[in-house]
Design a protein with these regions (language model features):
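Alpha-helical tetratricopeptide repeat
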Residues: 2-6, 13-15, 19, 23-317
Length: 317
């Protein structure tokens, strides 16, 4: 199943939790700890690394300091170094959040097997964590283990049914195994939680189209467009459905919008030309088809030969 949907939806909860407990620290270490936290919270991750490193020099067996330095390094995309810090924290004092964040960082390095292993370990601390099941499900999907991913998303929902993203991700997977009604149910559930979920409208529209419910599909594309009026793909897909319903003028309006967003889109000119041809606007149709050809959409020339040049020959006769 293509995982490209997951790119639009997949939304890992990459939260690097900061433990504000400061027991067991000397006064000087506490200051470095606090300065590290302040730097981290203000987005100064390199400074945070420096402060946490100084704190570690004074207390090299404090697991929390390695965890925090790992968080800062992960923010800097120093993923291998972050993983080493989380690993040290785990060796010193295994905690759920250490495994969780190392698992999330393994995802960043595309080491999905180790990520899943870390989420398994984290779940031993809390088997009711919806977030952990979500993250493991996401990783399973990236690994191509779709059945396991669906099970994990279902577990996540059983522990917390208020997260629209989980429904969207599970709906994507149902779609991939052609369980279209289940996919529609999940996207509808997501929209009941978040009526501004553009991706849920978009995905549900595609599912409606697959089962022949074209009006519902057009309606959902329209709602997605309201939320994101510059997404060219939405107009293309809605336009295609309108053409299928012989709503050529309305479809032409969608292609006109695409052209306003992407003036060099040869496909949009071609499609609009076909729409114009179907409503007997021959001059406009041929102008668009010629423009499509100029922009590299070479299929247009065959239509020009059969439609536009044929009309010219008739006029000459």
């Amino acid at each position: 199943m293509p995982v490209e949907k997951l790119k639009l939806t997949i939304v890992v909860l990459f939260l690097f939790l900061l433990n504000l407990m400061m027991f067991g620290c000397s006064t000087s270490q506490l200051t470095k700890y606090e300065l590290g936290l302040e730097s981290y919270n203000n987005g100064r991750y390199r400074s945070a690394v420096e402060y946490f490193t100084r704190a570690i020099w004074e207390d090299p067996v404090n697991a929390e300091l390695y965890f925090l330095r790992g968080n800062a390094k992960a923010k800097l995309k120093l993923n291998d170094e972050a993983i080493l810090n989380y690993t040290t924290a785990i060796k010193l004092d295994p905690e759920m959040k250490y495994y969780e964040n190392r698992g999330l960082t393994f995802i960043e390095t595309e080491d999905y097997l180790n990520a899943i292993s870390d989420f398994n370990e984290a779940l031993l601390f809390d088997s009711t964590s919806s977030t952990l099941y979500f993250n493991r499900g996401y990783t399973q999907a990236l690994s191509g283990n779709y059945e396991s991913a669906i099970k994990d998303y279902s577990r996540a929902i059983s522990h917390d049914s208020t997260n629209a993203k989980v429904f969207v991700n599970r709906g994507d997977l149902w779609s991939g195994v052609e369980e279209h009604q289940k996919a529609i149910f999940d996207f509808t559930s997501a929209l009941s939680l978040n009526k501004r979920d553009e991706l849920a409208y978009f995905n549900r529209a595609k599912e409606f189209a697959k089962i022949g419910k074209f009006k519902q599909a057009i309606d959902d594309y329209s709602l997605a467009i309201i939320l994101n009026p510059t997404n060219v793909e939405y107009y293309f897909l809605r336009g295609e459905l309108k053409v299928g319903a012989a709503e050529f003028l309305s479809a032409a309006a969608d292609y006109t919008k695409i052209i306003s967003l992407q003036p060099d889109n040869g496909n949009a000119y071609y499609n609009r030309g076909i729409c114009y041809a179907n409503i007997n606007l021959k001059d406009s149709a041929c102008d668009d088809l010629n423009r499509a050809g100029e922009l590299g959409f070479f299929e247009a020339y065959e239509v020009i030969r059969k439609f536009c040049m044929k009309e010219e020959k008739k006029k000459k006769k």
